[in-house]
């Protein structure tokens, strides 16, 4: 009968719609999983960049310098050196880091930077955009620091949905420059995982160096400053402005 045919056609159409919805759901789920895997892998694997010839990296260089170098192997000393250098600053502080967290050690650094800004020292911070967005931008103490008139903060290449292919362009630089002369550089981020005596159940083993020359700017300090200036002015950075009305 016509009624039976209509029922059959209706059921067939309903099944087709259901099958279509299932396929669409699987497609969206698959694309989402692929993107998530891509994002996670991008955070782990640095971009493959090779701009120097092998012969350049193996060249022997002889340099005579009056700079002095101090090696820092201990995580407690690493925090104390950062605080000591920040407190000694008279004109300018530059800090670049991949990961900065408002935990115990990170808050100590934030407090020292705030104290320097209160003394009239100009403070510039550049922090990798992914970690800053995940771990730092919502911190009240960091918001207070960023709202200070003498502090500028930039996030390096934060995630942009319109430029997902750049998600693995991360900034792993970790250095602290004081008054354009003395600087600390190494592999430690600014958090309990790398600094201090035990704000976390485990700590990374890493190393820093402090390079100084009695307050006089040297060739290596100038090279680092030039590099910082290039990174600071990149269009991929985003200035972080604290919500001053909350502080």
Where are the language model's segments positioned?
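N-terminal Sec-pathway targeting helices
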Residues: 13-34
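Signature of lipid phosphatidyltransferase scaffolds
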Residues: 171-247
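Solvent-exposed loop/turn segments at secondary-structure junctions
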Residues: 99-102, 129-133, 159-162, 182-183, ...
């Amino acid at each position: 009968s016509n009624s039976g045919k209509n029922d059959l056609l209706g059921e067939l159409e309903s099944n087709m719609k259901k099958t279509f919805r299932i396929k669409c759901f699987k497609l969206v789920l698959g694309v989402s999983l692929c993107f998530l895997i891509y994002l996670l892998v991008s955070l782990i694997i640095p971009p493959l960049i090779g701009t120097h010839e092998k012969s350049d990296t193996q060249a022997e260089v002889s340099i005579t310098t009056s700079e002095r170098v101090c090696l820092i192997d201990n995580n407690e000393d690493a925090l104390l050196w950062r605080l000591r250098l920040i407190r000694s600053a008279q004109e300018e502080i530059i800090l670049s880091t991949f990961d900065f967290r408002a935990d115990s050690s990170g808050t100590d650094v934030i407090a020292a930077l705030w104290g320097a800004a209160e003394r009239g020292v100009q403070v510039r911070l550049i922090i990798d955009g992914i970690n800053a967005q995940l771990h730092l931008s919502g911190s009240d103490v960091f918001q207070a620091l960023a709202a200070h008139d003498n502090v500028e903060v930039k996030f390096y290449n934060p995630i942009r949905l319109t430029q997902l292919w750049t998600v693995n362009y991360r900034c792993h630089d970790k250095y602290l420059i004081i008054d354009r002369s003395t600087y600390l550089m190494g592999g430690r981020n600014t958090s309990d995982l790398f600094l201090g005596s035990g704000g976390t159940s485990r700590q990374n083993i890493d190393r820093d160096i402090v390079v100084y020359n009695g307050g006089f700017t040297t060739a290596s300090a100038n090279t680092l400053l030039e590099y910082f200036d290039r990174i600071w002015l990149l269009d991929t950075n985003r200035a972080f402005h604290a919500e001053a009305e909350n502080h």
